[in-house]
């Protein structure tokens, strides 16, 4: 079909041509009109835009509907803009109803590289004669009075024909040519058709009371279509005068659209010359008056006054036609009708409307809001998204434009309209808010919103614009519409890490799965473009070439880094991991950061003895017997895989047996001879425990047993090879090697300091000795003197006394053994009853006291138990029973515990406690500590004892006495020894009675009753009548407790009548 171009009158042609050229130069837009018939087959070509617009079509040219349109009605081919009928076809009656003209209007955009063009297309759908007229009813009854005048019109029901124009209803006639009636078909001012039965001659009911006629309705199609209906006319005999309107059959009224409700339009004063009820006229709207008119206008039934009942709107309807019927009330009332035409006068009461249609994206679904708005605009209806329908602007609109859009890109189509007429309906539009967008005229009442600059969503994500439309009325009305343009995100930003390098520290031996750190990257884009995921970049780690993914892992969502294995500082000290952050855009952008994982050392390696190599945890060093003191006899080398303080090694010799004769450099590992081995026989073995520890917290240690074997000869024994930088080789003349292995330089300031320190030490020791002696003498004077007993059979010099260990070893014969307590040599104190002159020479005492060297006491002693075969004092270890041990000799203190006596060693008689009792200083029965000595029971007793302490032959006659329950303390020793035999007080350890050997507890305290025999001992305790010799106990290595037969106890003479005779077998039952 060729396009229909209507250029108007010749006088307006130059003006239209000028306007067309101006529009083409600015917007490159044009209006094209086509026409087609309804019921055309789907696919029928209506026209081609490219040909009709004389456009050169290239490969990049495309035509697209500006708004989403119902493709079932019309289709636009994208390549050349060819318009065709859709699959559903075009039905004019369904699209436009009874409208005289049916036009489909829409906009098409032509895109190319050079420019884009907006084409306004109007397609007129022409009617075809596809519908025949039809009567509402097949039988139509009509009544007419016999007194009706010629020309009386009787309304008939109009046939309906859905076609319009020439194809619509054209004629309605009677089939009988000779009848007193004629049917006339008229068209009203509003376009509606009406049919009247016109009386051609007077009627006489008496001659013919009814007429049966046939109505024929015919349209103007080719060929024409027709329909018939039966018409029954009944002639009534009644009132012969009808009411008459003074205005005639037609009355016209003009009404302003802003007239208030209740305004009078017309006074219909109809008169009837008849009298009585035949002349009483009643007014009413005729049957053809539409319901809308009945709602807007009110007719008084008695007076005939026509008033305004509701507001009218010129833009909605500008003309109303009312049928008013006046009827009398006589029998067979007569009626007259009057047609009232109400014309509405326009005023400027409507503000302009603004409709914003964003550019629809290709392939947008038809259910989207943009598609619904476009379809509604194309069909000429109201905006589907507007709740108030047509004429109500939306509160705001939103468009979406990508941030990568070029300048002059189309954003939206703005359409303005005003329902007023004339100058009141002329609208102008403007855009405010930002210079990045501007408004460009498109065609009449329409504008294009285009970009005026490049956009960046990261800088401005949303533009708030304002559209203002104003008409030219007096006064003008204005509409302000907010408009939002949101910038769509594109993937133009790569993720960025907060730091290029992350430093992380982790201790070695971490558990697998341990958390290390979290890296964070930010992407300024939105949605998937800003969704950051993390991953490891593969690389080889260390010399082994393992993949970094076997060491650590990263959470793709959070960036948290976890260890997959336990790290070892000795094999891997730093792990460089490169993390890549990628977004979810297309194309994908990424960046990376370096994570340096530093492994911190832990003390997880114990020292390893390297040289000499141990055999089963033992070392053997041969030392010549004539080796000089401070000579390096061996060098110990060890290594530790840890570093720093964890790898710093310290050497120490512990548990040297039988005495301390060697020392080791704490840092160098050089073992020096510190004792004299010249008197040791070859083969003598000195054992020590070598402890090598590192500087960790806690430290790790390695131990080995070192055996020093004394060999014959004067040279040095084999030692570890000294390194070139060892202290022995690098010692300058005049210096000596210390125990720690460091070289000491004997310079003058050092000598002065040593001399001064030694002098001060000697002076302090002398002051302490004098004060101690004076204090002791004051106490002895205060007590009235010490009890001293002569030792019978004491021999001078160093001769062995009868009963001594040496004599027992030579086989001097059987004798009772004794319990001797060694004292510190040189203290000046002797046992009970023995003068100080009776003390053995220092050489003899030194030979018996362990740890003494060269006849000088070491300051330590031990509890020495003398047995039948040999003395075991050589293996006893020193132990002080009081906190002041080693400072001052302390006397033993005896305390009655309620069931047994216990002895302790204290510095003073009133200071035998080492802890607070919780009582006050003046409390009755105050005791500062538990002095029972129970902690030493199991250390002092190594094996079970059988029998009592001091049973004699007298016990068989007189029974057991108190002496049987306690050892001898005050009696003289009949068998002197070469040592100072300190008498044993009865206030010693709690006596123990034998128990079942299978029991776990091998002793219990014996209950000692207060007898006359023990009363003397108890009084001695109260008067502090005891020896001040220090008694030292040795818990680690106690000798065995003497048996009953081995204890020499003097006979105790019990007073007669003191005890009853024991029963037979009492001795065995104890």
Curated annotation (Swiss-Prot):
GO-annotated biological processes: cell adhesion; cell-cell signaling; chemical synaptic transmission; homophilic cell adhesion via plasma membrane adhesion molecules; modulation of chemical synaptic transmission; morphogenesis of embryonic epithelium; regulation of synaptic membrane adhesion; somitogenesis
Chain spans, region Disordered: 382-401, 715-736, 779-861, 907-929, 1045-1070
Cytoplasmic side: 771-1070
Source organism, top-level taxon: Eukaryota
Classification via Gene3D superfamilies: Cadherins
UniProt-listed InterPro entries: Cadherin-like_dom, Cadherin-like_sf, Cadherin_CS, Cadherin_N, Protocadherin/Cadherin-CA
Compartments in which it is found: Cell membrane; Cell projection, Dendrite; Presynaptic cell membrane; Postsynaptic cell membrane
GO cellular component, one term: Schaffer collateral - CA1 synapse
Extracellular side: 30-749
Name this protein carries in UniProt: Protocadherin-8
Species in which this protein is naturally found: Homo sapiens
